[in-house]
């Protein structure tokens, strides 16, 4: 694929630059450059289709005026321009205060962006390669979008990237089960690189969006927040690639920084799709925003917030680690609160290998609806396909691996569910009697028969004796050979 080859060439050029150290910096560098090219290509189109349209970026800093000419500025002058003029200008863009102000998007992206490259000549080579991609060409944009997702997957090897990466198959499955419609307010309070939002967009485009009005309705109802600079920048760029003209709904900030009670009725949402960071701990003082559930554990605080944010009949799908299911103390109170305020109708239990290589931890997909309390909970155990020991980088989880669960689900009304080798039902009373411990194992699993212990011990002794005999034979052969 030409796009893949182009981006690989760019990465190879960056590896020659002494200032770029590792995957995370390389991807960050790539992203702000692609962002400016995508914005400029969109500007070209909007200038033709919208009367009076003006780019959010001042003329001197528009891609077309400093980066597009292959024979343009290079070397030390280019490096100085980027560091001393371009970045300061974009970090301090003045906002118009009008709705849909794309200047906010640009300023937020560059707020914590950084130019890692030290060679102006290598920067020029990268710019010229990027110019080979036309983001107004739908076919090229689609191919680049596919490659961009692979680029996000590459973040798995970039340190603590697991905090904001969820496998595409998992996000697609959750979006499909939640079934968002255009106009329903959909929120991801810890959006990372935007995987849940893009899967929700694809789901709505495939099933419901038929007119420009419906598309506008879908876009206007999206909400997202990301705390860290790199995933925020990646998310905004991801939205642009998905044809969203104004991704200012992706805010850069900490959703947990507000007191829980300050979220009022007009901020409630219809849908929450999210994967709060595993094992994250918030800074001092954040727990004071949650007086009833005072803890520094990020996943717990997000769960409390989600219950608060949902409208009556609102629905959520949330990824949580096993620790949230069996934990005690604050976690127990939180699960009791969840089951009193919401119908926790389904928990899909995933194997430890789904989030490898950066996390080997049991995870769960919780599906619940605000309103009626929980009467019973269906559990579904997702297993690694037969013939495969675990999911991995080379054999990751795919959407087709969820097809059995989707067939069992019972449609929108969840009708006709039956207990199977993978599925079992637990009443709310049973869960309450367990102290709200939701770490309930599959009762249909048959324990592996390892055989009679005495027979196994005898076999072990015989095997060890055979090993000793072989070792003695080898010693004798070696001694004889050395004596010659």
Identify the residue ranges that each predicted region occupies.
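Short, contiguous acidic/charged loop-to-helix segments that flank catalytic cores in large enzymes
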Residues: 17-21, 283-298, 322-330, 351-358, ...
């Amino acid at each position: 694929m030409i796009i893949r080859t182009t981006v690989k060439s760019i990465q190879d050029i960056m590896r020659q630059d002494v200032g770029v150290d590792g995957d995370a910096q390389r991807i960050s560098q790539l992203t702000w450059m692609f962002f400016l090219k995508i914005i400029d290509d969109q500007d070209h189109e909007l200038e033709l289709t919208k009367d009076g349209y003006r780019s959010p970026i001042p003329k001197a800093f528009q891609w077309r005026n400093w980066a597009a000419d292959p024979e343009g500025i290079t070397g030390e002058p280019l490096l100085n321009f980027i560091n001393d003029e371009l970045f300061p200008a974009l970090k301090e863009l003045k906002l118009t205060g009008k709705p849909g102000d794309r200047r906010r998007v640009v300023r937020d992206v560059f707020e914590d962006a950084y130019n890692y490259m030290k060679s102006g000549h290598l920067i020029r080579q990268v710019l010229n390669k990027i110019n080979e991609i036309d983001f107004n060409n739908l076919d090229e944009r689609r191919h680049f979008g596919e490659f961009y997702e692979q680029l996000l997957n590459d973040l798995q090897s970039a340190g603590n990237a697991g905090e904001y990466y969820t496998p595409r198959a998992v996000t697609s499955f959750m979006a499909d089960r939640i079934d968002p419609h255009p106009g329903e307010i959909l929120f991801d309070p810890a959006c990372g690189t935007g995987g849940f939002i893009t899967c929700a967009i694809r789901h709505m485009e495939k099933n419901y969006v038929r007119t420009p009005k419906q598309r506008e309705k879908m876009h206007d109802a999206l909400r997202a927040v990301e705390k860290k600079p790199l995933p925020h920048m990646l998310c905004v760029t991801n939205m642009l690639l998905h044809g969203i003209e104004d991704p200012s709904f992706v805010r850069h900030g900490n959703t947990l920084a507000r007191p829980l009670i300050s979220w009022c009725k007009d901020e409630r949402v219809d849908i929450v799709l999210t994967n709060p960071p595993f094992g994250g701990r918030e800074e001092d003082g954040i727990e004071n925003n949650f007086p009833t559930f005072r803890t520094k554990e990020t996943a717990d605080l997000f769960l409390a917030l989600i219950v608060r944010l949902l409208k009556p009949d609102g629905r959520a799908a949330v990824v949580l680690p096993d620790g949230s299911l069996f934990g005690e103390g604050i976690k127990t109170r939180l699960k009791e609160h969840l089951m009193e305020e919401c119908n926790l109708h389904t928990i899909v239990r995933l194997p430890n290998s789904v989030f490898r290589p950066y996390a080997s931890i049991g995870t769960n997909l919780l599906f619940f609806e605000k309103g009626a309390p929980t009467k019973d909970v269906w559990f579904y155990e997702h297993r690694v396909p037969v013939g495969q020991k675990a999911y991995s980088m080379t054999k990751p989880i795919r959407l087709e691996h969820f097809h059995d669960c989707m067939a069992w689900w019972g449609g929108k009304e969840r009708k006709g569910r039956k207990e199977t080798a993978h599925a079992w039902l637990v009443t709310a009373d049973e869960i309450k009697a367990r102290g709200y411990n939701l770490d309930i194992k599959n009762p249909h699993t048959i324990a592996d028969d390892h055989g009679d212990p005495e027979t196994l011990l005898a076999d072990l002794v015989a095997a060890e004796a055979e090993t000793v005999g072989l070792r003695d034979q080898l010693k004798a052969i070696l001694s004889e050979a050395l004596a010659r």
